[in-house]
UniProtKB/Swiss-Prot annotation:
Protein task: Associates with the EF-Tu.GDP complex and induces the exchange of GDP to GTP. It remains bound to the aminoacyl-tRNA.EF-Tu.GTP complex up to the GTP hydrolysis stage on the ribosome.
Keywords, comma-separated and alphabetical: Cytoplasm, Elongation factor, Protein biosynthesis
Localization in the cell: Cytoplasm
Region of interest (Involved in Mg(2+) ion dislocation from EF-Tu), ranges: 82-85
Entries under NCBIfam families matching the protein: tsf (TIGR00116)
Matches recorded under Pfam families: EF_TS (PF00889)
Organism in which the protein naturally occurs: Prochlorococcus marinus (strain MIT 9215)
Protein name (record): Elongation factor Ts
Family, per entry: Belongs to the EF-Ts family.
Single GO term (MF): translation elongation factor activity
A GO-annotated cellular component: cytoplasm
Claim: Oxidoreductase is one of the keywords in the record: no
Length: 218
């Protein structure tokens, strides 16, 4: 792997407008080759999408997805900059795909890491710090292990961090950025709600013997 310097990361950011972590990842994937890293970012749809990310996305559409068997349903709001784009095939296809992703990910609760409340992060840290396999380890080592575990756990709760169900080489965030690059507008997943049939309802469970006895008394 090539030597990934801060200057190299800055040069790539200046050329593409991509985020620092995306630039580092691109340079790592291409062994520090600036031209190849630029191409890598473009293929991922990140290079041009990042430059649009600061623009206001106030238009868009609310999509729905009902999974086969009608036991899981999703409502999702996807925003863009213009009504014209919201009606287009690329945007509508993305809306359907991201809604389907939510249906397939029952553990997902938030759109992005930034939305996770601080008390949830603290609770996860307390749980991890109390695990038996960390007892006896130096505090500094323990903190490092816990940090990695928390990051993994929090990413499991975040929609944009999920591997895309139709192509696991992409995350949902990268999928959205690709669409933004194609369209030429900022696109944001604003919010979603996932419904599961019977969720929260206490069911009266009967074992087989009780069920037979009940039928005989009726």
């Amino acid at each position: 792997m090539g030597n990934i310097t801060a200057k190299l990361v800055k040069d790539l950011r200046d050329k593409t407008g991509a985020g620092m972590m995306d630039c580092k990842k691109a340079l790592n994937e291409t062994e520090g080759n600036l031209d190849k890293a630029l191409e890598w970012l473009r293929k991922k749809g990140i290079a041009s999408a990042e430059k649009k990310s600061g623009r206001v996305a106030a238009e868009g559409s609310i999509g729905s997805y009902i999974h086969t068997g009608s036991r899981v349903g999703v409502l999702l709001e996807l925003n863009c900059e213009t009504d014209f784009v919201a009606r287009g095939d690329i945007f509508q296809s993305l809306l359907k795909d991201v809604s389907m992703q939510v249906a397939a990910c029952p553990n997902v609760e938030y759109v992005s890491i930034d939305e996770i409340p601080e008390d949830v992060v603290k609770k996860e840290k307390q749980i991890e710090m109390g695990r038996d396999d960390l007892s006896g380890k130096p505090e500094q080592i323990k903190e490092k292990i816990v940090e990695g575990r928390i990051a993994k756990r929090l990413n499991e709760l975040v929609l944009l961090s999920q591997p895309y169900i139709k192509d696991s080489s992409l995350t949902v965030e990268e999928l959205v950025k690709q669409a933004a690059a194609k369209i030429g507008e900022n696109i944001k997943v604003r919010r979603f709600t996932r419904y599961t049939l019977g969720e929260g309802i206490e069911k009266n469970q009967m074992d087989f013997a009780e069920e037979v006895a009940s039928m005989q008394t009726n």
